[in-house]
Amino acid sequence: MGINLQEVSYTYQAGTPFEGRALFNVSLEIKDGSFTAFIGHTGSGKSTIMQLLNGLNTPTEGTVLVDDVAIRSDSKNKDIKNIRKKVGLVFQFPESQLFDETVLKDVAFGPQNFGISKEEAEKLAREKLAMVGISEELFEKNPFELSGGQMRRVAIAGILAMEPSILVLDEPTAGLDPKGRRELMTLFKELHQGGMTIVLVTHLMDDVSNYADWVYVLEKGRIVLSGSPKSVFQEIEFLESKQLGVPKITQFAAHLRERGITFDALPITLEEFVEAIKNG
């Protein structure tokens, strides 16, 4: 199951004095089984696209196709609800959405909301909590008694319990320490390897180079560049003009190139850099 945006535009608060255009005639494809990243400066339209992918918002113009189900400005709630089960959306700081009295109940709420029995929902909740690294001794605790990193994992388990085939992540590691960030990104990598389509919004270019297989660059509601991370991160000057960076190792290699060391293409991961130096 993939997602296609066909000439999609989105206007906030249309028809009011506060009207603002967030997307302009955007067309793109998120392929089934891909790990697609979106990068762009604040206000570029990344989060707006994320909210369109699972029907949280509907396009002002154009069509969002999810597994051949169309979301348009006049789409009915029934169609959108089915899409929200297929496309799980993890907001930035998702722990702010926790609400129930125990960890287990919180994670089981989503599946029950889609008509799954309490028994089956709790079974799913246990499975997904284990998947994100939450031990059974925490299942009956109030989620607000957990650490920030644990709360983040519980919130993500709640999305996974609805068994989406596409997982949309809006800055999922924001505010976490390096260890917590690595652990979460490893989880998303494992989900992707298991067949799940992953969509990632991030400002961390090293995460794009290490995990994504396709990247879209947005500016002021338009796609200005797209391609494999390898090809996109060769465009250092262009990205800098958009107030965006490149992976640390790519920047380092670019400095070496200025000093006379040649590369067939700038490496975007440490492994590529080591290989290039060995073969240099």
UniProtKB/Swiss-Prot annotation:
EC number: 7.-.-.-
Topological relation to the membrane, as annotated: Peripheral membrane protein
List of residues binding ATP: 40-47
Assembly behavior: Forms a stable energy-coupling factor (ECF) transporter complex composed of 2 membrane-embedded substrate-binding proteins (S component), 2 ATP-binding proteins (A component) and 2 transmembrane proteins (T component).
Function of the protein: ATP-binding (A) component of a common energy-coupling factor (ECF) ABC-transporter complex. Unlike classic ABC transporters this ECF transporter provides the energy necessary to transport a number of different substrates.
Protein name: Energy-coupling factor transporter ATP-binding protein EcfA2
SUPFAM superfamilies: P-loop containing nucleoside triphosphate hydrolases (SSF52540)
GO molecular function: ATP binding; ATP hydrolysis activity; ATPase-coupled transmembrane transporter activity
Superkingdom assignment: Bacteria
Domain ABC transporter: residue ranges: 3-245
Organism field: Streptococcus mutans serotype c (strain ATCC 700610 / UA159)
Root EC class: translocase
Any Pfam family hit: ABC_tran
Matches recorded under PROSITE patterns: ABC_TRANSPORTER_1, ABC_TRANSPORTER_2, CBIO
Gene this protein is translated from: ecfA2
SMART domains, alphabetized: AAA
GO CC, alphabetical: ATP-binding cassette (ABC) transporter complex
Compartments where found: Cell membrane
Chief location bin: membrane
Family of this protein: Belongs to the ABC transporter superfamily. Energy-coupling factor EcfA family.
